[in-house]
């Protein structure tokens, strides 16, 4: 990876690791490493199936699968009484273009109709030189595919580092809120907000969160995820 790219990543952690992994349904994790060690309220209601679709930030780069964001999110939702099942459909290295290529196939491969799909893509687009317009078009196509199937969408927004210049940064940062407004989706404007300024919450590559960093992300976003579920009560 070129030195200039490393300076970009040091300015703002982004997801950028190769290697593919199939989507998998998260299994119940050992409570020792969970955000919530025991349910705070009894789990009740119909099962809420969620597809967590993204890159290495979802796939769980260099952490055990029970410590990935989707796994810890499932545990946190269940601790709030939500009968959640989260499928980890994160693949390390995915750009929005790669995500679009597998999006419909991933939904087709599920043995259920999900109540929510979380789309977390865009970080690798910055490193691969995709324009904000390309990223926007790819994510828009995924939203349209989900809405064609009547599946609600939650967008996990990213931010461009200042190294790209103010014009690019403004265009990239705005694409998530613009898409959420245009398509009426739920949105977390910058889903790394709770950790990105603390280097101790990242692995040595300064890109991927540690287990503690992932726990912090889940704690900061679980309410938004619950609120994006149909007929959910926050």
Predicted regions and their residues:
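Sec-dependent bacterial lipoprotein signal peptides
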Residues: 1-15
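Serine-esterase "nucleophile elbow" of acetyl-processing enzymes
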Residues: 29-92, 104-113
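Alpha-helical cap/lid subdomain in secreted, periplasmic
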Residues: 100-234
């Amino acid at each position: 990876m070129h030195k200039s790219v490393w300076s970009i990543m040091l300015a703002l952690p982004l997801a950028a690791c190769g290697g593919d992994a199939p989507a998998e349904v998260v299994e119940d994790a050992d409570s020792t490493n969970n955000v919530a060690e025991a349910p705070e309220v009894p789990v009740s209601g119909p099962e809420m199936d969620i597809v967590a679709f993204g890159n290495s930030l979802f796939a769980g780069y260099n952490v055990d699968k029970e410590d990935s964001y989707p796994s810890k999110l499932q545990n946190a939702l269940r601790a709030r009484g939500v009968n959640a099942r989260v499928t980890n459909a994160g693949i390390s290295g995915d750009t929005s273009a790669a995500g679009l290529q597998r999006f419909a196939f991933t939904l087709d491969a599920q043995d259920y109709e999900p109540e929510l799909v979380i789309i977390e893509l865009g970080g690798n687009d910055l490193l691969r030189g995709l324009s904000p317009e390309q990223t926007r078009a790819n994510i828009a196509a995924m939203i349209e595919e989900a809405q064609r199937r009547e599946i609600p969408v939650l967008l996990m927004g990213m931010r461009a580092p200042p190294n790209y210049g103010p014009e690019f940064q403004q265009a990239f940062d705005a694409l998530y809120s613009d898409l959420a407004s245009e398509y009426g989706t739920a949105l977390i404007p910058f889903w790394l907000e709770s950790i990105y300024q603390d280097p101790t919450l990242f692995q040595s590559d300064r890109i991927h969160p540690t287990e503690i960093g992932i726990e912090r992300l889940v704690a900061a976003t679980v309410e938004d995820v619950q609120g994006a579920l149909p007929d959910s009560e926050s």
